[in-house]
Curated annotation (Swiss-Prot):
Disulfide bonds join 31-80, 41-66, 50-76, 54-78. InterPro entries: Defensin-like_20-28 (IPR022618). PANTHER family: DEFENSIN-LIKE (DEFL) FAMILY PROTEIN-RELATED, DEFENSIN-LIKE PROTEIN 23-RELATED. It comes from the Eukaryota. This is Putative defensin-like protein 23. GO terms for biological process: defense response to fungus; killing of cells of another organism. The keyword Disulfide bond applies. It is found in: Secreted. Pfam families: Defensin_like. Belongs to the DEFL family. Keywords: Antimicrobial, Disulfide bond, Fungicide, Plant defense, Secreted, Signal. It comes from Arabidopsis thaliana (Mouse-ear cress).
Amino acid sequence: MTTTMKIMSFAMLLVLLFSIDVVEGSGSSLCCNTHAKFGACNTYQDRKRCNKWCLDGCDNKKGGFCKRFAGGAKKCHCYC
């Protein structure tokens, strides 16, 4: 019975591993990246502009947000 349980557990693990949806980001794409070249990302208008910039530039159409970094700096980051 323990051998059967081990085989079933291994089979279930394989099913889970192969069913995971992998998202890749490429360096030249806006998606999944932070963009310092976007400029300031401090006000509500900047957040709206960042979101629109990512919506227009990413194929996934998920938008973006102003991500906080060390020192309190915020930069535009597009969702994966």
